């Protein structure tokens, strides 16, 4: 039982890490929380290669400002002069941003106690950032059972 709790807590941390790279926040405190999370995971890696990967990520991130990460995020996902990388399951499934996969996610979420905070989170329910966040929450809930 304890092993499952530990594994689910670790999963939650990694899902949060991934979510933070796909959910744009201009708030500096969120960026510094991401840096802190990477440091925690680096100090407690799943294995040697994960520790090295986390160290490489830390080296690339500016420890004092989120400006570079925000620019890279915009270039990848929003810049109209480049080929944007789409972030929704619906797009990859049907070629549209809001389709069957979004409906499936809404129906799935309706069966849980979790909800999307529509005041602070504007991406669709089938966006990769939201899915990672949801997986983190579900992993935390499993760990707490």
Where are these regions (language model features)?
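Surface/interface-facing alpha-helical segments and adjacent flexible terminal/loop regions used
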Residues: 1-145
